[in-house]
């Protein structure tokens, strides 16, 4: 019987173990998409205790706590202490067997805290609390200290077009920080004209860009100014959260002006008008990214804020989102083609939340590859509900069967936690075990030089090359 979480966790044969320990584990982390706070990195935040760094803002854990029947006051309540929330988590973890949270929890205790051979639960919680808090009191366990321990080379944060990016500039000017922190352009509030807050948001964009927006070309001018600002601060990637993927042929500016005018006047838009405006903005933005050498990321298929009562109480991003089931293939094809037809499709990474769409994306990327850029259009790593063992394996296998796994840009945390870098370790172990199993079964050559190069490329090298502006 195998022992739980040894050094060879998830590595089932000697080939896999060699690939992981010798080649994957030493590679730096290129975390090109996350939701870390740039201010916390700039300020090198120090955490008061394990409960704070572990549970603050982690909606994966919050969902598990709710599923275990824990009172909301012990999850997000302002009236309860970090220790009380921590103990609620300690009582919940033994109930998470089979959920990736059980693996992640113990991986996060191993690295960076060095706690091994101990199962986390109510019986061990006090000892672990003391050990971890002692380490969190040292400089090596500040926000940047943890990133350095985990060998993080680069992170891409998620930033609104109206953001000042003051903390990115502060980080870039600080010679003591050897981790690159690049902003990523997230313009969801610009192209989602149907949202209640769209008009108010345009007012904020006007102020940030110093452009009055009454026509569609005004919007282009405002966005261009903000794109220039992001570029000056080191941005080289965009990200778009798309719940419903719409497409309609882009109308002329007169029609777009009319659509924007109706929305600014408080009138209700038709589905066609929403699709026309959304497509026009996304296609125009995509062409701007291509001209700048940026990467375009599309995260497709979440249903957000399902629980109205809890949304009113807590707001967004608090654990009440799930997988959508809209059809995406036709609209996605037309959207990408609208940029490619003029040879202005940027480097693009596609992510789906519904795993039934894996093969859709794995085959879609082959339609729009381009010369001179290996893996120009990528099928992104298992996202959100899919960044667990089964979801990662499905994505890796389907990409390998329908595309080129060797060109894959690999894993990202997509996380708000400084302890989530162990997800890169989790991914690397799964990747090495998959390749090791294929080699052991005679499906691919047992060639250490060939396999090690592929592992190192997927773990770091491909992403570093892909996100470099040439």
UniProtKB/Swiss-Prot annotation:
Q: Does the keyword Zinc apply?
A: no
Cystine links in this protein are none
Pfam families in the cross-refs: UxaC
Q: Indicate the transmembrane segments per the record.
A: none
Pathway note: Carbohydrate metabolism; pentose and glucuronate interconversion
* Reactions mediated catalytically: D-glucuronate = D-fructuronate; aldehydo-D-galacturonate = keto-D-tagaturonate
GO biological process terms, alphabetically, are: D-galacturonate catabolic process; D-glucuronate catabolic process
Entry GO MF terms = glucuronate isomerase activity
Query: Which HAMAP family is this protein grouped with?
Result: UxaC (MF_00675)
Task: Tell me what this protein is called.
Answer: Uronate isomerase
């Amino acid at each position: 019987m195998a022992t739980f979480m040894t050094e060879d966790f998830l590595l089932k044969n000697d080939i896999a173990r060699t690939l992981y320990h010798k080649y994957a584990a030493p590679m730096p982390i290129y975390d090109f998409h996350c939701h870390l706070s740039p201010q916390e990195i700039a300020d090198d935040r120090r955490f008061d205790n394990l409960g704070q760094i572990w549970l603050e803002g982690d909606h994966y854990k919050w969902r598990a706590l709710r599923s275990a029947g824990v009172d909301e006051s012990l999850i997000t309540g302002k009236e309860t202490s970090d220790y009380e929330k921590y103990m609620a988590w300690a009582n919940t973890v033994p109930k998470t067997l089979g959920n990736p949270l059980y693996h992640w929890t113990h991986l996060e205790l191993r690295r960076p805290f060095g706690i091994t051979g101990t199962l986390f639960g109510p019986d061990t919680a006090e000892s672990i609390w003391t050990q971890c808090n002692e380490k969190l009191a040292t400089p090596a366990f500040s926000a940047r200290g943890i990133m350095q321990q985990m060998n993080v080379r680069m992170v891409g944060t998620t930033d609104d077009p109206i953001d000042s990016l003051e903390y990115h500039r502060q980080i870039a000017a600080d010679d003591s920080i050897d981790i690159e922190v690049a902003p990523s352009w997230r313009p969801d509030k610009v192209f989602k004209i149907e949202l209640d807050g769209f008009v108010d948001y345009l007012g904020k964009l006007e102020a940030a860009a110093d452009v009055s927006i009454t026509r569609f070309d005004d919007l282009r001018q405002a966005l261009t100014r903000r794109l220039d600002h992001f570029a000056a601060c080191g941005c080289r990637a965009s990200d778009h959260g798309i719940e419903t993927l719409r497409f309609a042929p882009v109308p002329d500016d007169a029609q777009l002006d009319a659509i924007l005018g109706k929305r600014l006047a408080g009138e209700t838009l038709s589905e066609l008008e929403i699709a026309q405006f959304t497509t026009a903005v996304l296609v125009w933005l995509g062409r701007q990214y291509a001209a700048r050498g940026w990467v375009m990321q599309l995260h497709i298929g979440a249903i957000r804020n399902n629980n109205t009562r809890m949304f009113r109480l807590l707001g967004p991003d608090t654990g009440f989102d799930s997988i959508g089931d809209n059809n995406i293939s036709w609209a996605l094809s037309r959207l990408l083609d609208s940029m490619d037809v003029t040879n202005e499709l940027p480097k693009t990474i596609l992510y789906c939340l519904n795993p039934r769409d894996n093969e859709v994306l794995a085959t879609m990327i082959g339609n729009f590859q381009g010369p001179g850029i290996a893996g120009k259009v990528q099928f992104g790593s298992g996202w959100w509900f899919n960044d667990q063992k089964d979801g990662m394996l499905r994505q890796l296998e389907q990409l390998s069967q329908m595309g080129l796994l060797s060109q894959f840009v690999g894993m990202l945390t997509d996380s708000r936690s400084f302890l989530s870098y162990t997800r890169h370790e989790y991914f690397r172990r799964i990747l090495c075990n998959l390749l090791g199993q294929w080699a052991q079964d005679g499906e691919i050559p047992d060639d250490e030089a060939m396999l090690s190069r592929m592992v190192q490329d997927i773990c770091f090298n491909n992403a570093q090359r892909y996100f470099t502006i040439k």
